[in-house]
Design a protein with these regions (language model features):
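Small cysteine-rich, disulfide-bonded extracellular modules of the LU/uPAR three-finger superfamily
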Residues: 1-93, 97-135
């Protein structure tokens, strides 16, 4: 999987360390699914909040001692079944700070996915399937 930090996150980190601007950690982080991948500066096209879609909470992360600039999700993430219609082909995902589709700020994004979610299809990320890198 490829991907990157969003410009929003990079700016927040710089402001925090260089200007003493406090960034308040969100209560939860959410993973969303995209039919057009976001980039560092664009939002992409997220699956809309219809047909059973809702971003999923992903608050548990593991940091590696050998690669401390990376974090991975620690548990299975399962989206509800797509019903009554499918969501299309999922090509990317993103971690954001808000629950609603298209809301909040993208913090990190990842591409390299290619999964068609048809009627009653379910999207999942196994534990350790999402790797975020601070580079």
């Amino acid at each position: 999987m490829g991907g990157s930090n969003s410009d929003f996150k990079e700016i927040a980190v710089l402001r925090h360390f260089l200007l003493s601007t406090v960034y308040t950690q969100p209560a939860h982080l959410y993973v969303g699914l995209y039919t057009v991948a976001p980039t560092d500066s664009t939002a992409g096209t997220e699956v809309p909040n219809t047909n059973g879609y809702v971003r999923q909470i992903v608050d548990a992360w593991t940091f590696s001692g050998t690669t401390p600039t990376q974090a991975q999700n620690t548990s299975l993430i399962t989206f509800p079944a797509a019903t009554p219609a499918g969501w299309g082909t999922i090509v990317a995902g993103a971690i954001s700070d808000a629950l609603g589709s298209g809301s909040g700020n993208i913090l990190d994004w990842f591409d390299g996915l290619s999964q068609l979610i048809g009627i009653n299809g379910v999207a999942e990320f196994l534990a350790n399937a999402i790797t975020l890198t601070q580079d």
